[in-house]
């Protein structure tokens, strides 16, 4: 059964004639079943997503037409691109730089998104690739822009898109590499700083949930030689960033995609996280609540969960429901660090 489609997709439904018969590549902030409709209109459809949760929700319906990864390569083979505007402008630039080499000369460029989400910067985003785009539609506080690939494009070079900075967490210095739009892409956030300052020496096995650029897991791996570190995230750009952060610091760890605990087997001595609570432009608690509630099932006996969260988020009642003991081990006006034991 299909789910309700977003306001952006409702606007696109009004303009479906634009996609008929196209060899269409779709990417960006995908969040609903609308690509299934596109599959019935186009000559061929390829959906590229960096969101493992979305990939899992659509893979059965779309099959080989949907791809999950941090990059897409190959020869030019598409005559149209539909980019659904991501929250981060830098991520939109990354996707355009990656996808335009896969387009034939003269291919059509479509950008769609919510007005409050940066879509009205389409002129500047598309300027490197062609003339000024036309606004095709504006509805439900969303806009659709239409341009043409009329300028030559450079081959996509993944390495040039990694940001790099030095991170200091207590006595531990780390080099961080991160792709656009990834959490902790440009600096160590204050919440993660508080979390890392609250953690003791550790051994055994550790799960870094929602790893972002890999800062938390990498700092703990560097502080605790012999600690077996596993990092998971739903974002393919975060996963590749974490792999690079581990590698550049000479650290070992396992990194893979998991939708909460979907791909996690075995149990850990510790789970540590600065859990995400935003999805796109919307605050999103459900995945984090599932993460907290199911954590005891993935902890060894005497295992523990340590998280940092914005002080206004009501996570303590959830933790107290599912763990034998929960305490706040550090806090200030903005953040709280919770330690929960099974």
Swiss-Prot record:
GO terms for molecular function: 16S rRNA (guanine(1207)-N(2))-methyltransferase activity; nucleic acid binding. It holds the Pfam family MTS. The keyword Membrane does not apply. GO terms for cellular component: cytoplasm. InterPro entries: DNA_methylase_N6_adenine_CS (IPR002052), Mtase_sm_N (IPR013675), rRNA_ssu_MeTfrase_C (IPR023543), RsmC/RlmG (IPR046977), SAM-dependent_MTases_sf (IPR029063), Small_mtfrase_dom (IPR007848). It is an enzyme of class 2 (transferase). SUPFAM superfamilies: S-adenosyl-L-methionine-dependent methyltransferases (SSF53335). It is found in: Cytoplasm. The keyword rRNA processing applies. Keywords: Cytoplasm, Methyltransferase, rRNA processing, S-adenosyl-L-methionine, Transferase. Its EC number is 2.1.1.172. It catalyses: guanosine(1207) in 16S rRNA + S-adenosyl-L-methionine = N(2)-methylguanosine(1207) in 16S rRNA + S-adenosyl-L-homocysteine + H(+). NCBIfam families: PRK09489.1 (NF007023). Specifically methylates the guanine in position 1207 of 16S rRNA in the 30S particle. Belongs to the methyltransferase superfamily. RsmC family. Monomer. HAMAP family: 16SrRNA_methyltr_C (MF_01862). This is Ribosomal RNA small subunit methyltransferase C. It comes from Aeromonas hydrophila subsp. hydrophila (strain ATCC 7966 / DSM 30187 / BCRC 13018 / CCUG 14551 / JCM 1027 / KCTC 2358 / NCIMB 9240 / NCTC 8049).
């Amino acid at each position: 059964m299909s789910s309700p489609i977003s306001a952006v997709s409702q606007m696109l439904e009004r303009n479906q004639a634009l996609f008929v018969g196209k060899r269409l590549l779709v990417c960006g902030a995908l969040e609903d079943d609308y690509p299934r409709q596109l599959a019935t209109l186009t000559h061929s459809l390829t959906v590229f997503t960096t969101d493992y949760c979305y990939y899992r929700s659509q893979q059965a319906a779309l099959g080989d037409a949907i791809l999950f990864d941090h990059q897409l390569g190959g020869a030019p083979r598409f005559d149209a691109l539909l980019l659904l505007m991501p929250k981060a402008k830098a991520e939109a630039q990354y996707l355009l730089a990656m996808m335009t080499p896969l387009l034939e000369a003269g291919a059509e460029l479509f950008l769609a998104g919510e007005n409050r989400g940066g879509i009205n910067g389409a002129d500047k985003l598309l300027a490197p690739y062609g003339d000024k785009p036309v606004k095709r539609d504006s509805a439900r506080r969303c806009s659709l822009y239409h341009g043409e690939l009329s300028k030559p494009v450079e081959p996509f070079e993944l390495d040039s898109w990694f940001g790099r900075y030095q991170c200091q967490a207590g006595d531990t210095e780390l080099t961080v590499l991160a792709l656009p739009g990834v959490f902790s892409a440009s600096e160590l956030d204050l919440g993660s700083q508080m979390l890392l300052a609250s953690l003791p020496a550790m051994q055994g096995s550790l799960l870094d949930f929602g790893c972002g650029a890999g800062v938390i897991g990498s700092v703990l791996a560097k502080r605790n030689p012999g600690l077996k570190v596993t990092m998971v995230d739903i974002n393919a750009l975060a996963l590749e960033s974490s792999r690079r952060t581990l590698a550049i610091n000479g650290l070992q760890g396992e990194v893979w995609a998991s939708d909460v605990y979907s791909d996690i087997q075995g149990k850990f001595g510790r789970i540590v996280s600065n859990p995400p609570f935003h999805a796109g432009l919307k605050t999103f608690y459900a995945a984090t609540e599932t993460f907290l509630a199911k954590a005891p099932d993935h902890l060894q006996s005497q295992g523990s969960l340590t998280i940092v969260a914005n002080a206004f988020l009501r996570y303590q009642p959830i933790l107290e429901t599912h763990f034998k003991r929960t305490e706040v081990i550090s806090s200030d006006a903005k953040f709280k660090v919770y330690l929960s034991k099974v």
